Amino acid sequence: MPIEILTVCTGNIVRSPLSELYLRLLLADLPVEVASAGTQPRPGEAMTEHACEIAAELGIPAAEIEAHQAKRLSEPVLAGRDLVLAMTRAHRKAVVELDPSLLRKAFTILEFARLSRHVTDAELHEAGADAGDNPRARFQAA
């Protein structure tokens, strides 16, 4: 069972889709699925031209960039997520209001970066070993 990550911003046409596509690229060899959503999108809208340019510069395939369509943050979109990365505290608040069970799984990007900086490789290895071979269980243990 893959690890389910969601990135969240306002319109789902710049920050969260860039984060989604870049995480997919970086984590392509791992059992991870990444999606994105917006708190106030125009459903179906494409990424902005500037966001598309940045994505291309990051090495994201054109087909993936062009396939993006903005979608609204909702309970079904949040269902089963192991990690939610919000662009701002307001976005994180919107996530937790929709699904309070995500309180300990939803972070702003900055919060997640600060927290992950303090976890050592040894701690990750120990947590992973205790969780067995299931990638999702290993991720949750970490």
Label the predicted regions.
Residues 96-142:
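Phosphate-binding/catalytic loops
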